[in-house]
Amino acid sequence: MKRKVALGCVLMLSAMTVLSGCGGGGDSEGGTSEGGKTKIRFASWDVAEDVDRQQAIVDKFNESHDDIEVTLEAYGSDFDTKISAGMGSGDTPDVMYMWNYPAYYEGLEPLDEYIENEGEEYKTNFYDTLWNYNSIDGQIYGVPVGFTTHALFYNKDLFTEAGIEEPTGDWTWDDLQTAAKTISEKTDAKGFAFSMKPDPYDFEMYLWSNGTAYCDEEGNMDGYINSAESEEVFQMFQDMEKDGYAIATEKNGTDEFRAGQVAMYVYGSWSINTLNEDGMNYGVTKIPSFGSQPSVSILSSSGVSMSKDSENKEAAWEFIKFWTNEECNKERIGLELPVLNSVVESEKIMEQAEYAPFYVMLEQSDGYTPASFIMESWSEVSEDLSLAFEEAFNPSTLLDVKEVLESSVQ
């Protein structure tokens, strides 16, 4: 999985504007080919070798279906631009990868009836939490294909060098800070790294873990983003930086972790392949908790959706079913974490130490709704929060946390 569900939702407002003006019209290249096959288009955001792997799966579908022909359209970094333009002109691909449902759902076909017709076993084979991230206002607009939660990565060699025990699943943030201090004192590395300008979508998980959020169910921020629980979270991160055993990085911390400059950081499963290729001696465990409260993670999730304007919806659904079946879920391991219970079991994913924590965090994170799914003005709010967070965490500023959070609700 290459995309994050609401990567700042930077295109939300423009996409909503486009969607508000889109009308009927089908896709311009849909219909029937000369061979009598129903032609459908499938849009992906992947690039390079990932596209090659996707094309191989599309080829398998085409070879096994005499009546449907799928064409893969790899948009890469132009994905959002082309999907928005397609929805505005009525020329959207029949099937597409999807992440930013708040922005695009008006141009998508609700899939509840299709899913219901497949029977209860079809839906329950997916991890239930993932349906929440592929739905808007109780309606499902995408079938899950990939996800990641976040977990704590740690450098085993640095823990050995510092002479301390490795992190465990019952760690609290106090435990992490104690270890980070020791590592900073006994090695040339810092104990922990986090982004000086974290993605607000991601950072809300820390507030959830401490009993609060950015806003309530109506989108009201006052009393939430500036609550005592929220202040405690932000103050903890800032204090770790001030005390010198954590660093605030320009990106997400992966570069510093790979270089052996930091012993721990929290991130999604995206870096696993890279760390394995590096031959790094690392471990993964759950995000630490605040006291006795279970830690919670945000989900970065992707689904496969159908255009509401598709003239070939039955064929599109047939392809969606194929793309989300067990065989294809297995073939995409490495691109995306499996979303089917049956595949996780058959491939013994929970026995793989680097992957299991992401599923444990998935189970612990059910029932939380990101502010991006609640607030209509999330695009603007996200930009404001990002700037505010940078003021609190940038080592050149380190503004007062309470003042920063109060300014976020004004």
Task: Enumerate the predicted regions with their spans.
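Short, low-complexity disordered leader/linker segments with a strong preference
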Residues: M1-R41, E63, E406-Q410
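Extracytoplasmic "Venus flytrap"/periplasmic binding protein-like
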Residues: K60-F126, E161-G163, A263-M264, T274, ...
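A structural signal for short loop-to-beta-strand junctions that line the ligand-binding cleft
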Residues: A85, D94, E120-L158, P294-V296, ...
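Hinge/lid segment of periplasmic solute-binding proteins
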Residues: M98-T149, N281-T285, M350-E354
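Extracytoplasmic/periplasmic solute-binding protein
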Residues: Q139-V145, H150, T160, D175-D222, ...
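Glycine-centered hinge/linker elements that transmit conformational signals in sensory
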Residues: A180, G219-A248
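Mature extracytoplasmic/periplasmic domains
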Residues: S302-S377
